[in-house]
Structures are given as C-alpha cells and as structure tokens.
Amino acid sequence: MTKGKVDALLGIVFGDEGKGKVVDVFTPRYDIVARFAGGPNAGHTIIFEGKKFVLRSIPSGIFDEGKLNIIGNGCVIAPDLFAAEAHELESAGYDLKSRLHISKRAHLILPTHRVLDRAYEAAKGKNKVGTTGKGIGPTYIEKASRTGLRVGDILNDFPQKYEALKARHMQILEDLHFTDFDITEEEKRWMEGVEYMRQFPLTDTEIELNKALSEGKNVLAEGAQGTMLDIDHGTYPFVSSSNTVCGGVCTGLGIAPNRIGEVYGIFKAYSTRVGAGPFPVELFDKTGDLIREIGHEYGAVTGRNRRCGWLDLVALKYAIMVNGVTQLIMMKSDVLDGFDSISVCTAYEKDGVQTTDMPYDTEGWKAVYETLPGWKTNLTQMTSEEEFPQQLRDYIAYIEKETSTPITIVSVGPDRAQTIIRK
C-alpha cells in the first residue's frame, strides 16, 4: 500500500460478490472508506459481531469508530431509506454522526422518482430491464439533464425547489397515464429523512478527500454492483445508471487518476446475475438450483432469486482489462465444496463462431466450457491456504494463469474470520 492513494474495491462481474465483507476486513488498513456511485438499489451484507447488517447507502467502514466514511458526489440518496438504515445502525450502538460525511453534490431520490421508475418500466412492456424500482434511473436522468436536486439544496430554499420538481414529475406521470398511486405517507417519511440528514456533516467531500490524500492518508473506494452493470461497459441496456468501473472512482469522488493505487477486483468462484439481461453461463438445471440454494443467492435489497452459473472467464478478463485490476479476490469458494467437477466458461460461441473477447451484444451467445475436478472438501473451517486441497489450489492457479492476475484473498465463508489472505 502506498500512502496518499485511493485503492478501489470493485465488483467485476454482475455484483453481489460480498464487497461489504471485504471492506470490513480491509477497513483497519485505511483512514477513509468512500462510496462513489449508485444508491439504495445495491445492498452490501456484513456480519459483524454475530449480527447481520445490509448497508445500501452507508459505506461498510462505518463499524470502525476510528474511520471516516464518505458518501461521494457520484452517489444518489433517498433520505427516507438513508434514515431507516442509519437508525438501525444507531440502535445497535454505532455513532454515525461522528463517522459519516455526505457530499453536497450527491443527488436526491424523490418519492416521485420511484413512481417514475415504475411507470417507465411498465411502459416498456416485454422489454423491461428489471429495475429495482428504487428511483435510481430517473434520478440519474435528471442529473444528466441538469434538473435534479442535490443534497446541498436542502440547506437553502428547499421546499420551493422540491415542490417545483415534484410538479414536473406529476405532469410526466399524467402524460404517461400512470396516476394510480398515493405517496402521502412515503412523502412524510421522506421529509423526516431530509430533516435527519441535516444533522450530518454535509460537506464538499472532494476537497476533504484531496486534503486527506495530500496528508498521506489512505482511502478505500467501495464500489457498488459490478462492471457488467456499468452504464458504458456493461450489458446495455440491462445495466445500472452509473459508472461502476474504476473510472467512476475519479468522477464519483472528485479525485485525479494519478491518485489511484491498487485496484482490487472481487468475484465469486461461480457466476450470478439479478434481473433481466443476457447471461451466457446461466444454468437452468438442478446444478443452478443447487448453487443458488447453497450460496443463498437472493438479492439483499429485492429478495429476488439470483440467476446462477459457472465462472465466466470472458466476462472476468474483460472486467480486469477495463478496470486495470491489480489483485483479485475470490469469494464464496465454499459454495462449490460438494461438486465432483467444476466447469469454467473459456469462450462464447454463436453461429459456429467462437470468441474469447466480450461481444458488443452477448444476447444469443452460448458458453464454451472447460471442466476441472472439484475439491469435495469442507473449506469453511480452514484458516490458511496451506490447508487448501490440491484441486482448489489448481482452480486458483488456473484462473490466475488465464487472467494474468494474482488472487490474493480467498473467502471460505460469510464471516470476516473466514477470509484467507494468501502469501
């Protein structure tokens, strides 16, 4: 680790890898943990001191009282959901107001944004993207069109600004003939959330971060979702509305590219995807169901079944390339403990043509597999890589060779103690 750098921790396939747990493990190394993109559409699950927490907006370094946590300008925030999340943490004994700063430049998700999200999705009919309905897309639309509200707006003339934007939303909804909704109670909770947010330091976080870096402090940028959900580099249009790749760290926190240090790419030992969109490695058989059951593959925010499949090296290598990944972290290795053999996708095939490069559109491409022996060993009690069965060592070595990137951490269970740092 180099002092005065921002290390990025990124999901590098479709998200849901377990970034929250790794941030929790990494936090002692860093002075600041910052989220740079996304909103309450992605939940990071952490088991801390025996209790399960799902963090949707708040950085995962919040459990360490000696660390500053930052919600950066690239994020979008729903005040009501933020308040509910924060209250749960406060009731568990964590002092958030001394540990969390929020960028004044982050955009606000209004109750009507969530209605617009549902309305836009309904209008697509069969071509639904599979949105979480949290209002993320409509909020980023207004950010790009320069009509949104930001956190800093709650400090001055906010009621007038809010009512003006709400009226605009109501007109759009009327034009879409989407009028069967009542947000009265939701709006009340939202306004209470705004008042609660005023109790936190609402700051120019880009200035804070750059000053901290100049003082030699270390920052961990906590990614949300994954590379294949990036608005530019993902499986468009079945993507999120923000830049989830390493470039988003710079724009979402206001730091220069030369401030980036290590780029940690986190992935599962197999593949999952939530929602609609192409997924060449998806398994529709009992194997896919078994992976889902053993891995508890259900969305942390929506509860939706995750689609499951074998590891996709085409997607993994593409993500390593666009992010400049320097180290890999393999999660949920223990989920594959019971399999006699494990398949790995090495290429895609369509109309008799094979490719190892990520196509512009992955719809209709089928996975080409290579099969490796399984390890048939319970990994969950292991505490060092010396205990790894040879088949797992071979699996790790195979991935490292194919990706030309070292796997420096292997997770063998959900608890922070079940995280093995390789020598």
What are these regions (language model features)?
Residues 1-423:
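Non-transmembrane, aqueous-exposed alpha-helical and coiled segments at domain scale
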